[in-house]
């Protein structure tokens, strides 16, 4: 089922290639959308695609991301949005 999720990651998630590692994994899983650093030190992402693949991507970000220490993450259901690719926003 196609779905879109907005996710905020908190903890040690900036300055450790979190966004670029997420981009690589998203491309591997066929997830589209974007990811960006926020001024408060968190990272926000919008993941769009098959719900199972999005869950795998979130799990990777939370549990298997090199050097990251995700203390908390919030997931929000969004209206489905179609993207052409996955981007790192600056």
UniProtKB/Swiss-Prot annotation:
<protein>
    <recommendedName>
        <fullName>Acylphosphatase</fullName>
        <ecNumber>3.6.1.7</ecNumber>
    </recommendedName>
</protein>
<dbReference type="InterPro" id="IPR036046">
    <property type="entry name" value="Acylphosphatase-like_dom_sf"/>
</dbReference>
<dbReference type="GO" id="GO:0003998">
    <property type="term" value="F:acylphosphatase activity"/>
</dbReference>
<feature type="domain" description="Acylphosphatase-like">
    <location>
        <begin position="4"/>
        <end position="90"/>
    </location>
</feature>
<dbReference type="InterPro" id="IPR001792">
    <property type="entry name" value="Acylphosphatase-like_dom"/>
</dbReference>
<feature type="active site">
    <location>
        <position position="19"/>
    </location>
</feature>
<keyword id="KW-0378">Hydrolase</keyword>
<feature type="active site">
    <location>
        <position position="37"/>
    </location>
</feature>
<dbReference type="InterPro" id="IPR020456">
    <property type="entry name" value="Acylphosphatase"/>
</dbReference>
<comment type="similarity">
    <text>Belongs to the acylphosphatase family.</text>
</comment>
<dbReference type="Pfam" id="PF00708">
    <property type="entry name" value="Acylphosphatase"/>
</dbReference>
């Amino acid at each position: 089922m196609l779905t879109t999720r907005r996710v905020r990651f908190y903890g040690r998630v900036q300055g450790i290639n979190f966004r670029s590692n997420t981009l690589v994994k998203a491309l591997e899983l066929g997830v589209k959308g974007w990811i960006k650093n926020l001024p408060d030190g968190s990272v926000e992402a919008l993941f769009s695609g098959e719900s199972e693949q999005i869950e795998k991507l979130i799990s990777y970000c939370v549990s298997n991301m090199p050097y990251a220490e995700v203390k908390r993450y919030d997931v929000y259901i969004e209206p489905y949005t179609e993207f052409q690719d996955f981007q790192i926003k600056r």
